[in-house]
C-alpha cells in the first residue's frame, strides 16, 4: 500500500492481491449475500470478547462503559444499515492490518484454486479465511467504519472505502472505545434494511453469540451456554444450530459429544464431528496445525482456536471446552506448558477415541461417513500418539479383496478369518481399487483365496508399515520378494524347460540392463507373463511414488522382474530364441513386457517408447498373417 497524501484525510492503495480478493468475493458470493451480516456480527462479537478479556488482564486498557452488546439500526426508507459494538476497537495500524490487507497468507491462492475448479465460493468458506468483513461489498458500494481502540492514548478514526482499490483514514472525535460500521444498501439488497429480514438472519446464523444483539431496543438472540447444561436437556435442533454457529458450516454435524468431567481437573465441553472434511484441508498443507476447539475459562473465551486442547490428528473436531482450573490472564505460553491443559487434552483425546469406537459399534453407517472424510487424518496419529496407538489401530478400516467397493474390514476381522496355516496379514498399496485389483502380484493370493488389504489412501504407506504386527501376525506387503510362494498353483500349461528358461532370462537381463535388479522365475504368477516386485529391503512402489511427490531426494529403487515360464508369451519368446536369439522382436517384446508391468503399478513415467514399440509389435504381428 502507499500513502498518497499527508493531510487530515490519508488515502491508501490496496495491494494488488487485495484488489483481486475483493473482486473474487463480490462476484463469486452473489448467491449468499445475507452472510455479510453473519460476518459483521462475528467480528463485533470477537471485539467484545477481546475487550472483556483485556479488562480482566490488562490495566492499561480502557474499561467499557455500559452494556457489552451489539446494536443494529436500520432505515428502510433510505436503505441505511449500521452495526455497532462496544468492543476493543482498532488503532490506525490495526485498521490497516485488518481492513487494508489480506488477513491470512494463501487466502487468495486458495480461492482462485476453487474458482479454477469451478467450485462455488459459498458463505461456508468466507469466515474460515479471515475475509468476512469484505463480504459487505456484496450489498453496498461504500462502507464507513468509525472506531476507537481501548488502548490508552488512542484516538477516534474513520475508515472509508468503495472497494475499488483505495481507502481513506482520518481522525474523528469519538469518545468511547468500540466500532461502528455504516453503509447504504444497493437497490437490489434493500431487503436487508427490513427488520423481519435481519431478525431472521440473526436467528439463523448468530443466535448463540455470547453478547446480546439488539435491533434498536429488541434483543434478537438467546444467549445460552449449551455445554453448561445437562445433555438430557439439550434439543437436537439447538445443538445443530450451535454447531453451525461456531463452525461456519451450513451442514448439520454428523454427531456430537457432551463432556462433563470433575476430579483432578474439572471442565465441560461440547464437541462436534463434521459430516465432511473442511475444504481448506484439501488445499492447505498443514491446515490443522493451528486448529482446535474454542477454549473458555470461567465462561470467558480465551482462545478462538486452541491447538493445545487436542492432538493434531483430532483438530478437525469443532466445539467448546470450558474450565475453571486456569486463570483468566493465562498466556499462550502458559497454555502450552500448563499441566491442567495437558490433563484436559489427555482426557478429551481418550473420550473422543471412545466416541469413535462407540460409533463404529452402534452406528456403523455414521462411522463409515466419518471414516471416509477423516480416516486419512486420524491415521496420522499412529505415528505421533503412541499412548493411544492400540486404540487407533482398532479404528483402522480397509477395503480388501473380499469386500466390495466402499466396504471396510478391520484388522481384527481380517485376523479372525485367516486360514490356520496363514502366518501373516497381507496388504497391497496403490492409487486406487481398480488399479490394485489389476496388479499381477495379487494373482497368487486370489488363486489361493487369501485376503489382501487394499491400501489406496496415500497416507497408508507411511503409517501401515509402522504397525509391524497385529495379534502376533506380521503385516507384509505382497510386493516383498521374501514371501513364500512354494505352494502356488501351477498353470495347466507346461512351463518351458529349465535349459531354455535360463538363457531366456539372461537375454531379459541383458536387454533391461541396469534398470532392473534381477530377472527371476516367478512362482506367484498364475495368468500374467511378468510382474515387478520390490527387493527384500526396498520400498514398495507406492512408497516410492509418495517420496517423489514430496520431492524427497531418494535413489530410485531397482525392482525384480519375475517371469512366468508357463505363459504363452514367454513360451513363444523361448521359441523365437531357439530359432534366432538375435531376433530384434525378442528385445522389443521384453521392453514392452517390462514397461507394461511398470504401467500397471503406476510407475511408467513416459509412454512414448511404450506406444512406439506397441506399434512395432502390431506391425510385425499383422505382417505374419
From Swiss-Prot:
Keywords: ATP-binding, Chaperone, Cytoplasm, Nucleotide-binding, Stress response. InterPro entries: HATPase_C_sf, HSP90_C, Hsp90_fam, Hsp90_N, Ribosomal_Su5_D2-typ_SF. Residues 546-625 are annotated as: C. Residues 333-545 are annotated as: B. Its main location: cytoplasm. It is found in: Cytoplasm. GO terms for cellular component: cytoplasm. One of its GO terms (molecular function) is ATP hydrolysis activity. Residues 1-332 are annotated as: A. The keyword Nucleotide-binding applies. Gene3D superfamilies: 3.30.230.80, 3.40.50.11260, Heat shock protein 90, C-terminal domain (1.20.120.790), Histidine kinase-like ATPase, C-terminal domain (3.30.565.10). The keyword Cytoplasm applies. Homodimer. Molecular chaperone. Has ATPase activity. Belongs to the heat shock protein 90 family. HAMAP family: HSP90. This is Chaperone protein HtpG. It comes from Chlorobium luteolum (strain DSM 273 / BCRC 81028 / 2530). The lineage of its organism: Bacteria, Pseudomonadati, Chlorobiota, Chlorobiia, Chlorobiales. The gene is htpG.
